[in-house]
Amino acid sequence: MRTEYCGQLRLSHVGQQVTLCGWVNRRRDLGSLIFIDMRDREGIVQVFFDPDRADALKLASELRNEFCIQVTGTVRARDEKNINRDMATGEIEVLASSLTIINRADVLPLDSNHVNTEEARLKYRYLDLRRPEMAQRLKTRAKITSLVRRFMDDHGFLDIETPMLTKATPEGARDYLVPSRVHKGKFYALPQSPQLFKQLLMMSGFDRYYQIVKCFRDEDLRADRQPEFTQIDVETSFMTAPQVREVMEALVRHLWLEVKGVDLGDFPVMTFAEAERRYGSDKPDLRNPMELTDVADLLKSVEFAVFAGPANDLKGRVAALRVPGGASLTRKQIDEYGNFVKIYGAKGLAYIKVNERAKGLEGINSPVAKFLNAEIIEAILDRTAAQDGDMIFFGADNKKIVADAMGALRLKVGKDLGLTDESKWAPLWVIDFPMFEDDGEGGLTAMHHPFTSPKDMTAAELKAAPENAVANAYDMVINGYEVGGGSVRIHNGDMQQTVFGILGINEEEQREKFGFLLDALKYGTPPHAGLAFGLDRLTMLLTGTDNIRDVIAFPKTTAAACLMTEAPSFANPTALAELSIQVVKKAENN
């Protein structure tokens, strides 16, 4: 039906007769001449109709936005004064000789000249996807997956599919369950990841595996989360953690070079402890130059319980954040930041405004200065390298609250004051995570998942002191986003059962949920390690959007609903009966 794409016409096509298919993006009727911007997935080209082709001109008068049409005409160079430098096709236009209206369009529920609500965009997603910026994002996503496949093929990885209907295993979130008609009362689970299957593939001897795969998690959603999401899933045998990181770093550098023309360079490596200490986060945004500085040792003897309490508590922390130029902040802005840190459990926000250091106490402004002597204040200013015009904020509480609150404040202030260089790319690896974390009920939970190997510990040592265990795990972080994470896996049955025991999974439950894995570990399991990237998040970064729904063709809302198809929906009673399922209405509270 067509010979060329609209957006691919250039000066090299001048004089050629072309047939185009697409949509009317805009129409301008000048009476004796009608111009339209015609759009397809590759872009927009200007088409005009003149009186010498009367039939085509007459039919063109009926055109409206989003009519689906076919145009045949001749490519012409535009006059110099009419060249549109903002369009890829701006040096040419098409003089139409014939026009076919393939399909007319009703008045659109979306307005291309205004910002539409996200609800409307999701309800009429098929229209929203016609927008050039949306089409470009999905084209970029397709390019990314193509680049990944070629890279992985070139590096000896095999693309192997794993099951979608599998067994429920605890991986940190709720499973989506699928009832079995054949096995009454039993359920499959949609995979949260192919974790165990890819480990079993290593035990099968496939050595290098990858898959671009859908995963499912029934969890409370955020702006950057979806109930179904896509992973670039990778597993390797006989490779150390640094070797895995080297190959995966090469993949991501390849993507940035091909898609953005940017060489990311070598990725720095930082331990979890260092990231938390310096940035208050295990996914630090290194485009932001500000760092947290520990000052507890300077404040142990002050008569100010807000500082002295955490300073003398082994589980406490007092951290300072120097904000360059922050002395210009108003009291209202400071109060807003104080309320902001309360979201993260902090009780408030102490500060010192550094107006003129040379004047000592007279050169600062601080509600807590009366609790601190000149010597302590000077020591704090020295340690934070404070200069005239700076602001120093303080966080004082238990270590987690200080890290969470001050880490979040660092990001917010960096953005608000323009201190974060958003023109840069700042990748890094974060390694050496704690293996376990407190579950809040006196037990331990796996920080990553229960199949991660500890670093340099035997099963007996791990059992004796699990709180000291460091996971042989690694996350890739770019501009403050965790884009991928992985670990060296447990390849020894005793170690795996020890980890299960620490997590409170008794032997009976181990056999019930993981018997197949424990059996497989008996038969010469190779050491193996892997990683998974979030394709949606990678694409979000590479396309410059801050909303993950912009890079998914048909995403769900934050309530895990599809506004277009109205999923989820009630099931047919007959289908439920075949599955031996009865829906019980929840009693309403009176």
From Swiss-Prot:
It holds the Pfam family tRNA-synt_2. It is found in: Cytoplasm. L-aspartate binds at residues 171, 217, 448, 489. It comes from the Bacteria. Catalyzes the attachment of L-aspartate to tRNA(Asp) in a two-step reaction: L-aspartate is first activated by ATP to form Asp-AMP and then transferred to the acceptor end of tRNA(Asp). Homodimer. This is Aspartate--tRNA ligase. It comes from Shigella dysenteriae serotype 1 (strain Sd197).
